[in-house]
């Protein structure tokens, strides 16, 4: 998955996780542990995800998705993400967060530092 897709996946997982916490708080008959493995995806998740500025800017093709499509994306994340620990919304979000941090530390920050050095050299000449 590309870095941009990793960021979108992380966003979807964060929105879904937050909603599961809200649902478990509002309805004591729901188990958060179960919701973390079998999340309830409803219009709230769809609306928050599809209207998010990151989706609008970096993945506009995802903006018209419906509940079924979002459920499919989440299912794909559960199926296709290769992690060692048991899969749930938290472990998946941690994985994509870690991927994002690694990208920033190993690629983006060194690239920005090099650009700053290059600009400094140009100014010093």
Curated annotation (Swiss-Prot):
Subunit structure: Component of the SWR1 chromatin remodeling complex.
Alphabetical keyword list: Activator, Chromatin regulator, Nucleus, Transcription, Transcription regulation
InterPro entries reported for this sequence: SWR1_Swc7
Keyword Transcription belongs to the record: yes
Record protein name field: SWR1-complex protein 7
Function of the protein: Component of the SWR1 complex which mediates the ATP-dependent exchange of histone H2A for the H2A variant HZT1 leading to transcriptional regulation of selected genes by chromatin remodeling.
Subcellular location: Nucleus
Family that this chain belongs to: Belongs to the SWC7 family.
CC annotations in GO: nucleus
Source organism (scientific name): Kluyveromyces lactis (strain ATCC 8585 / CBS 2359 / DSM 70799 / NBRC 1267 / NRRL Y-1140 / WM37)
Gene Ontology biological-process annotations: chromatin organization
Superkingdom of origin organism: Eukaryota
